Regions:
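Short beta-strand micro-motifs within the conserved protein kinase catalytic domain, predominantly
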Residues: 31-46
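Conserved short submotifs of the Hanks-type protein kinase catalytic core
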Residues: 43-57
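Activation segment signature within eukaryotic-like protein kinase domains
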Residues: 75-76
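Catalytic-loop of the protein kinase fold
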Residues: 87-103
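Conserved activation segment of eukaryotic-like protein kinases, specifically the C-terminal portion
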Residues: 126-139
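Conserved end of the kinase activation segment
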Residues: 139-149
């Protein structure tokens, strides 16, 4: 029942922590420090405490800052730097989207939330359709074999959206309002 669910949830988080620990210390990746899991068996509850660097999520940042073209280019370069590290470590993030990008107080963009990230070996042996549909590469959506390039597709889609008044690519222009 509930205990099995929570135990499975914690195991998935432990996988994420292992990935984040492997890539910590790189400029454009959220810095994970450590975590603690506290089980409360009498209440069938768990506390999961995660210590990371303090950052602002990209959506929150965008509520108080207008992203200039120069900042969007910087965002792309910073996340490409993060993806280069992921490529070296054979990690596919699989969920590049604004909610998983963070900004520090110097304006550096960082990739975070490796909750559904997988190593290349695991992904190739067991394909799954995980991610956010708006940013999902066609091969992931179609459950076809995929590799690390799916993250570049998602990043490109996100950058396109920032540079085109929040409009996703491949939508017919007839869906736009006259003021768009």
């Amino acid at each position: 029942g509930a205990t099995t669910y929570f135990r499975s949830f914690v195991e998935n988080l432990t996988d994420e922590f292992a990935i984040m620990d492997e890539i910590k210390g790189f400029t454009n990746i959220v810095s994970y420090e450590d975590h603690m899991v506290i089980e409360h068996p009498d209440e069938i509850a768990w506390d999961i405490l995660i210590r990371m660097e303090l950052l602002t999520s990209l959506p929150d940042y965008c509520t108080t800052h207008t992203m200039s073209e120069k900042q969007v280019i910087q965002l792309g370069m910073d996340i490409c730097n993060a993806l280069e590290i992921c490529e070296e470590k054979k990690i596919i993030h699989r969920d590049i989207k604004p909610d998983n990008i963070f900004v520090n107080d110097r304006g550096d963009f960082k990739l975070g939330d490796f909750g559904i990230a997988r190593t290349v070996e695991k992904t190739m042996s067991g394909m799954s359709k995980k991610g956010t549909y708006d940013y999902m590469a066609p091969e992931v959506y179609l459950c076809r074999p995929y590799g690390q390039t799916v993250d570049l597709y998602s990043l490109g889609t996100m950058l396109y959206r920032f540079l085109n008044k929040n409009r996703l690519p491949f939508l017919p222009f007839g869906n736009l309002r006259p003021d768009d």
